[in-house]
Amino acid sequence: MPSFDVVSEANMIEVKNAIEQSNKEISTRFDFKGSDARVEQKERELTLFADDDFKLGQVKDVLINKLAKRNVDVRFLDYGKVEKIGGDKVKQIVTVKKGVTGDLAKKIVRLVKDSKIKVQASIQGDAVRVTGTKRDDLQSVIAMLRKEVTDTPLDFNNFRD
């Protein structure tokens, strides 16, 4: 029986490349001259450092621009609150989301069942497996999910016949 998995995962290699490009641009930009603005990464956690709130916004804009150029969806980013770290310096922790959350998985399963397409959807960890008898049914489910779920970027992989 044909099947595929619905997942939500950012390409961490491209995220790392975007961070390196952001740091390079920040170090050469005139408006950041003499400031301690930078982006650091620890696994799925990014930390933005800047001298004040305005420069933090500029660092965030540079990072978003570089991520977009590398085809990483910015909806993967979950922004924490801005913290003061001594003097005027500020930092913000940004988490890169991974996996389909429980609520989203239930929503996907409900959408698939309500669509009356002859397929079955089951939650498997941080992915949703959709199986059906016809490949055309699976392709119509993919089209329907792309149209209905807009708040989280979805990937469809592990397509088996």
From Swiss-Prot:
InterPro entries: DUF520, UPF0234_N, YajQ-like_sf. GO terms for molecular function: nucleotide binding. It comes from the Bacteria. It holds the Pfam family DUF520. SUPFAM superfamilies: YajQ-like. Keywords: Nucleotide-binding. GO terms for cellular component: cytosol. Nucleotide-binding protein. Belongs to the YajQ family. This is Nucleotide-binding protein Bamb_2603. It comes from Burkholderia ambifaria (strain ATCC BAA-244 / DSM 16087 / CCUG 44356 / LMG 19182 / AMMD).
